[in-house]
């Protein structure tokens, strides 16, 4: 089922969460990025188009300037993101450069999606970049985002991007295999929910936990993202980005994940 869904999808948004992107010590997992770029290039050669929504600016900032890691002042947090965003994009650039593929940075806030003119500019830029073979890499603009204009998490940003680009599929990479009936890190008997037809019914049957360690989104935000794209008729896959060659394994049907089916 997953392989069929990916096979028939041309326009794919991939969201990479902080926990997926980071090593256990909090640094950027550059091996993951290298592996991901190889898989994306392979699928691009088969006619697929990609937009990436990537967390990780703060992680990259901490890796670069660790002495600010424990500072709680918002100014320092935003400054870390400003430093880290440069490092993050450089890591992506280095991964795609051997294939002569360019990347483009897009930093957005909620205001950009709320204003019709800005929203149109986002859409036009996305279409232009992708049509010209460039891979857009999107993140929230943390350096200017205060509470009033924050999108809040990149699961939501990925859903907004998916809808505005009219994508065929959203894939969220996290550090778990999908949605479970209860937290698999705390319960060995947790059962993976592989196919979700009705999100409201799902919520009656599962336990929704808290936010993750590095990022701002937990299972609740992933379910909200699924609902947002499903309402536009777009399916979503939640999969474990920590697994080796996960994108190709999903395509081959050799890894399990959760599919949120779009309503008919």
Swiss-Prot record:
Family, similarity comment: Belongs to the glutamate 5-kinase family.
Protein name in the entry = Glutamate 5-kinase
Statement: the UniProt record of this protein carries the keyword Membrane: no
Annotated Gene Ontology cellular components are:
cytosol
| Gene3D superfamilies noted in UniProt | Acetylglutamate kinase-like (3.40.1160.10)
Q: Where in the cell is it found?
A: Cytoplasm
Give the organism the record lists: Alkaliphilus metalliredigens (strain QYMF)
Disulphides = none
